[in-house]
Amino acid sequence: GPMGPSGPRGIPGPPGAPGPQGFQGPPGEPGEPGASGPMGPRGPPGPPGKNGDDGEAGKPGRPGERGPPGPQGARGIPGTAGIPGMKGFSGIDGAKGDAGPAGPKGEPGSPGENGAPGQMGPRGIPGERGRPGAPGPAGARGNDGATGAAGPPGPTGPAGPPGFPGAVGAKGEAGPQGARGSEGPQGVRGEPGPPGPAGAAGPAGNPGADGQPGAKGANGAPGIAGAPGFPGARGPSGPQGPSGPPGPKGNSGEPGAPGNKGDTGAKGEPGPTGIQGPPGPAGEEGKRGEPGPIGIPGPPGERGFPGADGVAGPKGPAGERGAPGPAGPKGSPGEAGRPGEAGIPGAKGITGSPGSPGPDGKTGPPGPAGQDGRPGPPGPPGARGQAGVMGFPGPKGAAGEPGKGVPGPPGAVGPAGKDGEAGAQGPPGPAGPAGERGEQGPAGSPGFQGIPGPAGPPGESGKPGEQGVPGDIGAPGPSGARGFPGERGVQGPPGPAGPRSQGAPGIQGMPGERGAAGIPGPKGDRGDAGPKGITGPIGPPGPAGAPGDKGETGPSGPAGPTGARRGEPGPPGPAGFAGPPGADGQPGAKGDAGPPGPAGPAGPPGPIGSVGAPGPKGSAGPPGATGFPGAAGRVGPPGPSGNAGPPGPPGPVGKGPRGETGPAGRPGEAGPPGPPGPAGEKGSPGADGPAGAPGTPGPQGIAGQRGVVGIPGQRGFPGIPGPSGEPGKQGPSGASGERGPPGPVGPPGIAGPPGESGREGSPGAEGSAGRDGSPGPKGDRGETGPAGPPGAPGAPGAPGPVGPAGKSGDRGEAGPAGPAGPIGPVGARGPAGPQGPRGFSGIQGPPGPPGSPGEQGPSGASGPAGPRGPPGSAGAPGKDGINGIPGPIGPPGPR
């Protein structure tokens, strides 16, 4: 028959009792570590976590692949300025430049009058011969100082014995190239020093034949070097100049030898497999520890071997022009010099491009007259400046009439003159006899030890080292003490129901309420590792998640048993990746004002004030201080050539001690040069004889060829300061030189701090009216003084009587700039002039105060989870307890 309808659904039976807990299966094979994900940004620090029980050290995992380098950090705050370095010693003078082409022959001038003969000075003690010092760097060529007045020609001194050549030092082995140090602060460029006196001219050689230039005379024997002098005082260091371009990269050093691998520790016995306990509650994240104290700096390392000669790097940019140094102290007046001999006219300078007229500046009102400031302390001698631009040639002087002087009586013996420059080469002389070998001189005294230099700037921080290889696995720690047995668990659910007899199908009831969740069953065995998936591409970083709220602290459990002592620390894990750079910090508080910066270079000249009406003639003031001697006048044209004197008879060749020098005879004609003989024995020096009358100057020789620039010599030890000489007499004032072309306008200088008002001096005694002196050379422009306070408007005075027109007085020193007046009407725009030369760059200011550290930036998005590490070693098996609900976790035991 047909199939009947289905019966109602039966009532669900009671839940079955859980089966007994199974034992944990053996650990599966560790899976291969996956590729490292990108480094996520650093999250905010969490609350401090509770100390968990010390677990057994797991096996160290394999180090992950090194991730890509993080972004470059923001540039740090510039450090404070270092200790100023000591002033370097002056470099050796550069090689003498080529002689310029001979200028046009000038008209013969009138012969000068012979000056009064000076007194014979005492003969100085010959100093010991100094050792050759280490070669110093070649100094930069400075600005040519003003030509000093020519001194009186002294008598020709006896030629000293030839010096012994110094021993050539052995060439050192080339060491590894050292790291390039940071550049020190750039020294301030000083103003050119006062001109030194010109050396006395040597005796004149015989004139050559008409039309033929005279040959060059033989060079004199080298003099004995003086004793080393004391080192000079340390000068102030200038502001730091701009950093030059980085030098060439040094050669990489040889890789170090690999270290010995440590012995592998004994492998411990594996412990029995323990039952996995329930997971403990998640500990709170620990706070970030406070930074540790700064370590004591280590002792300085030993000095390494000298580096190999590196290849010179590209030439750095020209340094900025330093601020002009203060004027040096006034020198003692020199002795009255005899009129110098006519020099060679200089070469014609290169004609510069004509400057264009600048735009017409606005004429400001005249400022108030500044008060005379107190004289400042004498500044240190300036470093040698750079060579200036060659000046324009002066106009050709008028031809003087030939003089008709009467020969005067022979003068008294003059003071010993300085060694003159080598004269023109004379004709070859006869071959001289071969002298005997000289005795070796005593060894020179050792020089004084130099001042130790300042500590160099800190070197650049090294690159982070590569991740180290994980160390060997340590011995397994002792097993922990067995804990107390837990409390009896709650009664478990009833056991499984027995078999029931099949009853009639009942009526389907209403669905019952949802039953309570059953107790979780035992953990199953770990499955086999699945196949390794293909590493996908690195995804973009996710958005920054908001930090979660801190959870409430759970109730404290009952006190647990005292734990065992802490196990041995496990092997160090691999180094983590560098975190991303923090966000830019907030600007720091305004720092205190730093010390006043150095005075800047002189600013451009201010606008020319309006021409005032001539005032009444004032009363005669006290006599002014003695001015500096003016620059030497221009060298006049060479005088007429004198007639050649008859040759003197040759003297006999002597071997004995040197006799007294007789009166100078007439200069004889030089023979062809003979072969150089061996050095003769050093004779005892004889007494100086009276100087002969100076001869007439010979004709100008042709310019010699430029010699090869030699290697700079080693720097000698500082010489012992000699005795102070007697103060010289006041020399005659030199004629004012021609005004050179205007120099380039410098950049405006940094305004210096306002100076103190000068105290009012006591009135000096009324002096007699001085005579009008010859105008001295124009001095360098002074620094722009601070702006004076605006004066109160004066009451209108009654018009005074018109006085006689006064003479134009000497231009005074530039006073401090007055306050800026009201802006005048805009004048008509003048024609645009050609671009002028570029000014020097300003001095770099001192570094500002360091800013406050920035706040920590927001945490970035968490990166993807890394691969799961290999399972740890199995623990000891525990005692089978009654299956109960786990109790609360006890507090941690003491460490």
Curated annotation (Swiss-Prot):
Question: Which keywords does UniProt give here?
Answer: Calcium, Collagen, Extracellular matrix, Hydroxylation, Phosphoprotein, Repeat, Secreted
Could you name the Gene Ontology cellular component terms for this entry?
A: collagen trimer; extracellular matrix; extracellular space
Q: Which domain of life is it from?
A: Eukaryota
Q: Where is the composition biased (Low complexity)?
A: 20-39, 98-114, 137-150, 198-237, 302-336, 348-374, 383-399, 553-564, 575-593, 608-635, 660-669, 679-703, 753-768, 823-838, 853-886
Q: Which organism is it from?
A: Equus sp
Where is it localised?
Secreted; Secreted, Extracellular space; Secreted, Extracellular space, Extracellular matrix
InterPro entries listed in its UniProt record = Collagen (IPR008160), Collagen_superfamily (IPR050149)
Q: Please give the tissue specificity annotation from the record for this chain.
A: Forms the fibrils of tendon, ligaments and bones. In bones, the fibrils are mineralized with calcium hydroxyapatite.
Described purpose of this protein according to its UniProt entry: Type I collagen is a member of group I collagen (fibrillar forming collagen).
Chain intervals with Basic and acidic residues compositional bias? 51-65
At what positions is Phosphoserine found? 90, 556
Q: Chief subcellular site?
A: secreted
As a miscellaneous remark, the entry gives: These protein fragments were extracted from fossils. The tryptic peptides required multiple purification steps in order to eliminate contaminants and to increase the concentration of peptidic material.
- Subunit structure comment from the entry: Trimers of one alpha 2(I) and two alpha 1(I) chains.
> Of which family is this protein a member?
Belongs to the fibrillar collagen family.
- A Pfam family annotated for this chain is Collagen
Region listing for Disordered, in residue ranges: 1-895
* Composition skew (Pro residues), residue ranges: 152-164, 595-607, 741-751, 787-802
The entry's comment on post-translational modification says:
Prolines at the third position of the tripeptide repeating unit (G-X-Y) are hydroxylated in some or all of the chains.
Which biological process annotations from GO are given for this protein?
A: extracellular matrix organization
In the UniProt record, the signal sequence range is none
In Swiss-Prot or TrEMBL terms, this protein is called Collagen alpha-1(I) chain
